[in-house]
């Protein structure tokens, strides 16, 4: 049995035993608090960071399968891989601040911090209290320093302006109609789309040369007139990178990585970069995509 399997079954056994009438997810959150130092060091001293990360992902998948709640889906690691490569092209190994405004389980930031060679100052924002607790626990086990903010990311945030804001942007509707009125991209009537408000909020917290790297449903880009006006007057849409077709069951679920910046920025070319990422299994095609992206960057 591999170390990964040993760790998974060790934690899974305890979580199942402690679950009682509650959910596996709640039991996992409680167990990973590891208030007993002996339990904590038993994991940290005997298992690699990679095994801890993978075990967490498998445990989380089991927990989310039981909950059967689409809003609790996690960002696939391959998407984080694409974004980590984009950030390496943009920043090489510079120290930069990176915030995720819809961090959920923390999986996006976990993968980014382990896949990338960059030196990142990380901030995680999520409204869900259980997810915030879960993140605190797993980042503690991974010995990764992350500022975790448990609040609605669409409310005012007490953070500095960021070099990079990433998010796998939620697509549903935002329930707080009063707060949505603070946004230019709020709907003229009824509930506003989360995705549009997240794009605007990301722009609000970017520094002058910061870059928003957001995963959005592609149909968001084909929506309301106020979004087109916002693009003309308030931000730049610098790149639309469509994810591989094979990742989605049908065209309506298609997602893209978009890069946004503030007006008057000098980090990215103003000419929009349009591309579709080849499957990561197509090594030659993927290498060509990265080369095209680097060539585009050199045009600024």
Write out the residue ranges for each language-model feature:
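Class I SAM-dependent methyltransferase Rossmann-like catalytic core
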Residues: 65-77
């Amino acid at each position: 049995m591999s170390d990964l399997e040993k760790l998974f079954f060790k934690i899974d056994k305890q979580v199942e035993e402690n679950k009682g009438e509650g959910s596996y997810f709640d039991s996992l959150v409680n167990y990973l608090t590891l208030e007993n130092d002996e339990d904590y060091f038993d994991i940290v001293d005997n298992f690699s960071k990679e095994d801890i990360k993978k075990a967490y992902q498998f445990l989380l998948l089991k927990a989310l399968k039981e909950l059967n709640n689409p809003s609790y889906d996690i960002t696939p690691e391959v998407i984080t891989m694409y974004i980590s490569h984009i950030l390496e092209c943009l920043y090489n190994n510079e120290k930069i601040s990176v915030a995720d405004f819809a961090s959920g389980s923390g999986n996006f930031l976990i993968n980014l911090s382990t896949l990338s060679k960059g030196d990142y100052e990380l901030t995680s924002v999520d409204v869900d209290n259980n997810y915030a607790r879960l993140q605190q626990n797993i980042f503690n086990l991974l010995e990764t320093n992350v500022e975790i903010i448990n609040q609605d990311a669409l409310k005012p945030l007490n953070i500095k302006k960021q070099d990079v804001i990433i998010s796998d942007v939620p697509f549903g509707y935002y329930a707080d109609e009063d707060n949505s009125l603070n946004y230019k991209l709020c709907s003229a009537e009824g509930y506003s789309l989360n995705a549009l408000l997240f794009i605007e909020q990301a722009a609000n917290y970017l520094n002058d040369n910061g870059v928003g790297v957001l995963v959005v449903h592609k149909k968001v880009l084909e929506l309301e007139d106020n979004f087109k006006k916002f693009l003309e007057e308030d931000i730049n849409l610098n790149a639309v990178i469509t994810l591989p077709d094979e990742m989605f069951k049908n065209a309506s679920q298609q997602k893209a990585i978009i890069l946004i910046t503030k007006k008057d920025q000098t980090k990215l070319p103003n000419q929009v970069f349009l591309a579709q990422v080849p499957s990561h299994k197509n090594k030659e095609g993927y290498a060509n995509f990265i080369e095209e992206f680097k060539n585009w960057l050199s045009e600024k």
